């Protein structure tokens, strides 16, 4: 994990697609906005929902706090110093961006969605926090708990980084072959 204080940024990297349920993530962040005015949400990626998401961000008066910078070729450098990784997908296999964020020691809040890829990696409360699909309130509460409790954030970070050893590529491929 990164030593010292992280950037006051909550981050995700994904396609801007309905499957990712980004409106829920933005709504959960908006619930945090007043209590944590120093934080911003950065959503890296491109896709069909960009205009809709920008309209939502504008309607919530969060244009200076929720950023859609598009595609970043140096995404790992962008994500590494952030405070938290969030994924709000309605369904997902094993998310590469989630694995990369965990491997860099970012505390993560991720929906516990079918097919169950996140559940294969995250032990909720130990190395990340799983929340029910579509549950904005639960996502808000999980994000808030990490921001309010530096000891929890540090514990999640220390455990998250172990994903690098527990889930090398060959192990992930073997587990998927067992499922299929």
Indicate where each model-derived feature is located.
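A short, well-ordered alpha-helix in the C-terminal region of glycosyltransferases
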Residues: 138, 145, 152-166, 178
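Conserved acidic donor-binding segment of nucleotide-sugar-dependent glycosyltransferases
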Residues: 123-125, 129-136, 145-150
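Aromatic "clamp/platform" in nucleotide-sugar-dependent glycosyltransferases that forms part
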Residues: 71, 90
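A conserved mid-protein helix/loop that constitutes part of the nucleotide-sugar donor-binding site
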Residues: 8, 12-31, 48-54, 96, ...
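C-terminal alpha-helical cap of glycosyltransferases
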Residues: 169-180
């Amino acid at each position: 994990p990164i030593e010292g204080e992280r950037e006051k940024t909550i981050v995700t990297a994904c396609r801007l697609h309905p499957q990712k349920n980004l409106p829920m993530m933005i709504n959960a962040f908006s619930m945090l906005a007043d209590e944590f005015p120093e934080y911003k949400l950065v959503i890296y990626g491109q896709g069909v929902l960009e205009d809709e998401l920008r309209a939502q961000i504008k309607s919530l008066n969060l244009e200076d706090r929720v950023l859609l910078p598009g595609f970043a070729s140096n995404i790992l450098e962008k994500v590494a110093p952030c405070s938290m990784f969030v994924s709000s997908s309605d369904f997902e296999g094993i998310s590469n961006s989630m694995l990369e964020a965990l491997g860099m020691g970012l505390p993560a809040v991720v929906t516990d969605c079918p097919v169950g890829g996140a559940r294969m990696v995250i032990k909720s409360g130990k190395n990340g926090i799983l929340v029910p699909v579509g549950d904005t309130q639960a996502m808000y509460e999980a994000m808030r708990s990490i921001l309010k409790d530096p000891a929890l954030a540090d514990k999640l970070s220390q455990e998250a980084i172990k994903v690098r050893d527990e889930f090398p590529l060959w192990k992930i491929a073997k587990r998927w072959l067992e499922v299929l």
